[in-house]
């Protein structure tokens, strides 16, 4: 059960605005506080939140992986309790910087959870009984009282972005959009999306066509596809609309020699296979063989038969050399809000070097007249346009194609929601998608 209260956010800064995004002074908002149902049951839920949150704060692994393992190791936790625990953990993660600044040196999984439940009787929740959190100390209670009144948030905390990344991105509207919750996007696989949509509807799952992608469906609701037969039968695959569009914009044909060079678990390679209806051949390469090994299992479910994995890339005549480059992942913060705390300045420098090396390799292995395609799921300029500008300065044989023309000939959509024709920058602002960068460059044919 939930209890809602209305109130005003003091300058958009009050600690009680944690359940919402930054709002200007005087903006009416809805606070959502968690109402206890049965106190002992609720206390054990709070303890579970603390345990899961502690692991996330201490571990470098993605939060969703940690939560999955937490619940897998505790199969006795029911579905409603799992959802409650996961929702609370994600709520805290999405406002981690505000919690941290408000609590100061007292910030911990315990105090963050207590602050999240501050509208409840904390002495009943933190009662020290079996499966319940230990009682709050005087110091913790004092810190919580101060945190509830705290308003002096840094601008970076208001937009939930580490200071060094806040300075790089700068665009507060974009950061605000990256703090929202992403919809559930899927693409049709080897079928018409209307057919997939009707089948989903029969299973009680309601999707609408995506606004740009002709193969996509979207639900604004939380969707669990684990027991969905449409998904299990391979008629749909989870894929953000921007990623779907990028797959289409690669303009692959069955006669092309295609390589998905940083294939990972094969998301784009599998989309290519579907677009070609199993005609032609797609080579998939990744330095992480474990990730690459997942492609086979995914391809079996999707009935994709035209993908082959490759360890060593030697041929230099690829007509589509596609680089889905390793990156900061800053464009996916709507789905992975913890990722912003795992990236460091040093790691970003390493990634930039890797991206440049991969571009050099791709340039060497792209056929004359072919396209070298560079993709990231980042919104950081140094990973995107600056990386391309640096590459083009050293490689006059490559030139960006006209992306406005590419967009219109691929999608037959008059609206062009981008500011540049040299590349495409998808974001929750302009395309209502994750943040992606796409640049297709053509390699000149040597004059005879």
Task: Describe these PLM feature segments.
Residues 27-448:
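S-adenosylmethionine
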């Amino acid at each position: 059960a939930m209890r809602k209260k209305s109130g005003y956010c003091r300058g958009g800064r009050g600690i009680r605005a944690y359940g919402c995004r930054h709002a200007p002074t005087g903006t009416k908002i809805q606070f959502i506080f968690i109402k206890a149902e049965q106190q002992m049951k609720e206390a054990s839920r709070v303890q579970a939140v603390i345990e899961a949150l502690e692991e996330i704060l201490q571990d470098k692994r993605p939060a969703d992986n940690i939560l999955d393992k937490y619940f897998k190791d505790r199969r006795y936790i029911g579905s409603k309790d799992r959802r409650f625990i996961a929702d609370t953990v994600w709520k805290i993660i999405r406002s981690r910087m505000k919690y941290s600044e408000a609590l100061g040196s007292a910030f911990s999984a315990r105090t963050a959870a207590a602050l999240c439940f501050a509208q409840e009787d904390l002495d009943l929740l933190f009662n020290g009984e079996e499966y319940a959190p230990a009682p709050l100390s005087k110091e913790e209670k004092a810190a919580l009282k101060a945190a509830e009144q705290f308003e002096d948030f840094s601008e970076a905390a208001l937009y939930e972005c580490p200071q060094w990344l806040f300075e790089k991105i700068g665009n507060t509207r974009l950061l605000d959009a990256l703090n929202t919750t992403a919809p559930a996007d899927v693409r049709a696989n080897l079928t018409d999306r209307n057919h997939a949509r009707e089948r989903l509807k029969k299973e009680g799952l309601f999707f609408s066509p995506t606004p740009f992608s002709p193969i996509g469906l979207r639900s604004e609701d939380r969707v669990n596809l684990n027991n969905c037969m449409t998904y299990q039968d391979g008629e749909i695959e989870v894929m953000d609309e921007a990623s779907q569009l990028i797959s289409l914009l690669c303009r692959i044909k069955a006669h092309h020699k295609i390589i998905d060079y940083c294939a990972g678990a094969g998301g784009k390679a599998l989309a290519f296979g579907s677009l070609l209806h199993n005609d032609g051949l797609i080579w998939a390469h990744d330095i992480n063989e474990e990730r690459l090994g997942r492609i086979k299992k995914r391809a079996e479910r999707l009935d994709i038969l035209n993908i082959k994995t490759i360890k060593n890339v030697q041929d230099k005549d690829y007509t589509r050399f596609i680089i889905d480059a390793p990156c900061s992942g800053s464009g996916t913060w709507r789905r992975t809000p913890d990722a912003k705390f795992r990236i460091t300045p040093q790691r970003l420098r390493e990634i930039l070097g890797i991206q440049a090396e991969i571009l050099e390799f791709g340039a060497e292995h792209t056929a004359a007249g072919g396209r070298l395609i560079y993709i990231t799921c980042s919104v950081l300029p140094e990973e995107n346009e600056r990386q391309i500008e640096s590459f083009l300065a050293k490689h006059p044989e490559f030139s960006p194609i006209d992306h406005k023309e590419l967009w219109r000939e691929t999608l037959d959509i008059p609206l062009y929601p981008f500011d540049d024709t040299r590349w495409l920058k998808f974001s929750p602002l302009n395309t209502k998608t994750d943040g992606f960068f796409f640049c297709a460059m053509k390699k000149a044919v040597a004059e005879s």
